[in-house]
Each structure stands twice: as C-alpha cells, then as structure tokens.
Amino acid sequence: MRVNNLTPQDLKAYGINDVQDIVYNPSYDTLYQEELNPGLEGYERGVLTNLGAVAVDTGIFTGRSPKDKYIVRDDTTRDTLWWSDKGKGKNDNKPLSQETWQHLKGLVTHQLSGKRLFIVDAFCGANADTRLSVRFITEVAWQAHFVKNMFIRPTDEELVGFKPDFIVMNGAKCTNPQWKEQGLNSENFVAFNLTERIQLIGGTWYGGEMKKGMFSVMNYLLPLKGIASMHCSANVGEKGDVAVFFGLSGTGKTTLSTDPKRRLIGDDEHGWDDDGVFNFEGGCYAKTIKLSKEAEPEIYHAIRRDALLENVTVREDGTVDFDDGSKTENTRVSYPIYHIDNIVKPVSKAGHATKVIFLTADAFGVLPPVSRLTANQTQYHFLSGFTAKLAGTERGVTEPTPTFSACFGAAFLTLHPTQYAEVLVKRMQAAGAQAYLVNTGWNGTGKRISIKDTRAIIDAILNGSLDNAETFRLPLFDLAIPTELPGVDTHILDPRNTYASPEQWQEKATALAKLFIENFEKYTDTPAGEALVSAGPKL
C-alpha cells in the first residue's frame, strides 16, 4: 500500500536528482523478488537458502569501519561531543570540516541521482515521545530489507505525512578519491552531520553501518535528556521483572536474553527513561558462526523467509554451512523481532530494570563465572567494559587479546563515557537495581564455560537465589562470589579451582589486574573517576 506520495521531485531537496523510480517502503515479498533478480550482479545479488531466507555478501567489509567514521564539528557538536582529538580516552569520533562534508555529500547524492531508489521510512525507538523518524535511501534492495528488519516498522497510519528527523543516504557503490588531500583514513566513509541530521555512507556495503549509525545518534540525543542509552539486550519475566544484559560482540547478549522462560524486549540497543526500558529497534542482528538448532533453537528457527543472512557459506544445494568462517567470523542474520515467538507485544518496552548483567568473555581465564557488584564496582566495570578474545597466531598459538570498551560499546558513544555511567547509575538507584559481572569466556581448563552453566547462573540471578547465596571475596579483584548455585558445578565458581595450582591463577590474575589499572588511568582526570579507582583491582 502506497501511503506516502513521495516523488522524485521531493528528493531534489536532498540533492538527489533525476530519480527514475521510487520503491517506497517495499513489502517483504517485493524485496524477495528484487534481491533474487537474476539480472543483478556483484554484492547486490542475493542467494536463496533452503531455510527460506535470502543470503547476501558484503564484500571486504564484513564488519563496521570505525577508522572511517567522521562527525562534522560545528556549533552543535563542538562542546558536547566526545572527540577523538581531545582528552585521554581514545574513540572513533573524528572531526570533519564543513567543506569536506559538502564534498562527501556531493559524492553520495551524485551516486543516488538518476537511479531507481528504495526508500524505507522507519522509527528508531519504541517510545513515541523520544523516537527518531528515519528515512533510509539506497539503490540496493537488500539494504532496504536490512533496515526494514532492524528498525521499527510504522503502521500505514503512521506513514501518512511521515516527516523524517534524520536521513540516511547509503551510497555503498561510491568512494572518495580525494581522501588523502582531505586528511581522511581511506576512500570509504561513514559521516554524520548532527546539525543537518544526515548520515552518509560510501564505499562500504556492510549493513551494520546503518544500524549502528542510528545507535550513535541516539547515544548523543538521549543522555542529554537524562535518558540512559545502552548497548544491551533486555527481557522481562512473568512478574514484570526486567533484566538488561550489557556486553561486547560475542559475549552472549543475544543468546542469553533469548530465553523461553522470559519475553524478549530486544537484543542490542535500549533506552531507559521515567517509564522503564524500551527497545530502539524492530529486529535482531544475531551472530551465526557455529549456530546450531540444539544450542540456540530460537535464533535458528528465526532464520526463515524475510530473514536476511550475511556472509555465510551457501552450498550448491542451498544449505548453509554455519560452521564455515572463511569469509568472516562475523557471519550474521537480521530478522524482524516477531520471528522470535516469546517477545513483548505490541510495543517492545517494559518497566524498570531490577537486574543489570555485565557480560564478559574473559579469554585469560581469570574472572569468576559470576560475581555480585557493589555500586562503585558497577560504575568501575561499566566504564572498563572488559572482554578478551582468543586470536590464533601463525604458529597456532592462541594468546588472549584484551579489549576495554567503555560502557560495553565505546565505538558507538558520542558523549564522554562518564555521562552514560552517571545516567545509568541514577536509573539503577531509582529502581533499586543490582548489578552482576558474568564471565561467559574461559577458565583454567582452557575450555569455555558452557552455555548450560551460564544459563543456570543467569537463572540464579533472575530468580533471586544468587542474592541469597553465601559469598566469599576473590583476591586482587575483591569480587563477591557465591559459594554454590543451583544447577552449576560448584568447582568452577572459584576460578582458582580450575588451575593446576592457585599460583598459576595468581600469575595470570596479576597480569590482567595490571591491564585493568592501566586502562582506567584515562578516567582519573576527573574527581568522579579518581574516586572509582578503589573499586577496581588492587595489586
């Protein structure tokens, strides 16, 4: 149903001229036909899988390009944004001049001019009073499919007279040949102008740039209004008890919040205001590497018609090899949230959170599977945002690579991290919420803590049995660990037990503690940050 009389003439206001045709808010059936059009070439063309979902490739860009992210520095942003060239903390918010912005905008509008375009109008944010109305403009059908999956789909009534607050122009096929003279990182770019309220994409086909681009914008707008903006998943129990799960990619946010006993609010991006927790999105973007029907049935069954697979290996018979990471370990699927049966309806929001869970995948094997945090430890570990990855080396030796990402999402923060911590703590205090640190990574055995044990730990947090358990303190990190929990092997609760000797743990723990201390140094330039040092490890 065409409910918005958008014409090529309207696009001239954006600098896009001579548009051949507009496919406005296409249906899933239309997108399916467009993506599988045999006349398409290269990364535009989709492949049908035996699961019913279309699969696409994003080329060399199988993840975001943080080094190619820029924000126009002007009167709107000069004094509010967390800039990469100011202060101690490193981030991806590189300043862009107005002159270079105009050049990039010209490249993208030229690329989109004279084309047949897909335009998707959608919402970012489930609360009507704080949501963004976003217009996505692309020449690629599957990119329109991606944003239709990931953002909140308006009703026909809401599309009448839709006025965008933000425009995303995706010119994936164009690059910037003048990047060197302009002092940029490469010919590719993901640029934002918060005054004009436009995002430009050039050179990268990765769909996640549109998703995380809008997250970065929400991360700018909401905390300035006192609303928490969070890189987390969220779900709600039968009694209305809400839990949020913070964590970097690969720590288990999507897996652990997709729980048959609880209704899903969302799997990645949320706000927390005076009414409670609400989703920014209308879909899920799940990792699929080594996905199995047995371990993650809800996600597996969500991969059907209207879902969109990215960078997976599709065999000649249409079956998908989820174990093959030859294109990338970051294989993904996007699907509308209603592909998960157990969701909050009709709007993805619920009350205030009472359980706040920080997920870390510690490849050093030092941190306990679970610990209960004090108020100061909550802020310390939120600002630290620690996880660690196992990276294979040429000789097959695996050494852990530590990652400290402020607020478990530094790549998407547009304000200083302490602003997010302050807003979160205020919301937690008002709701009487308790925080926990959960390690979904490794221990001294060299094996990853099983999903079965981690799920039992999450159950113990959510049903309150962990709060009633006896605890002991782990040296160096001063973390409160339960002595036993239902359904969890007691032996693994103390990470020292999983080593051949306590001295081995002590050696690794000392090395990790030093990394925490070095990382937190960047927050000690404020009295609030200095006061939190004592909540971290002590050597």
Curated annotation (Swiss-Prot):
- Listed GO MF terms: ATP binding; metal ion binding; phosphoenolpyruvate carboxykinase (ATP) activity
- Residues binding substrate: R64, Y206, K212, R332
Tell me the keywords, alphabetical order: ATP-binding, Cytoplasm, Decarboxylase, Gluconeogenesis, Lyase, Manganese, Metal-binding, Nucleotide-binding
**According to its UniProt record, which reaction does this protein catalyse?**
oxaloacetate + ATP = phosphoenolpyruvate + ADP + CO2
What are the record's GO terms for cellular component?
Answer: cytosol
**Cofactor(s) needed for function:** Mn(2+)
Residues bound to ATP are 212, 231, 247-255, 296, 332, 448-449, 454
Keyword Cytoplasm in record: yes
The record lists Mn(2+) as bound by K212, H231, D268
PROSITE patterns, per this entry? PEPCK_ATP (PS00532)
Where it mainly occurs, coarsely classed, is cytoplasm
Q: Which InterPro entries match?
A: PEP_carboxykinase_ATP, PEP_carboxykinase_C, PEP_carboxykinase_N, PEPCK_ATP_CS
What does this protein do, in the record's words? Answer: Involved in the gluconeogenesis. Catalyzes the conversion of oxaloacetate (OAA) to phosphoenolpyruvate (PEP) through direct phosphoryl transfer between the nucleoside triphosphate and OAA.
Matches recorded under HAMAP family: PEPCK_ATP (MF_00453)
Q: Describe, as the record does, how this protein assembles with itself and its partners.
A: Monomer.
- The molecule here is called Phosphoenolpyruvate carboxykinase (ATP)
Name the gene for this chain: pckA
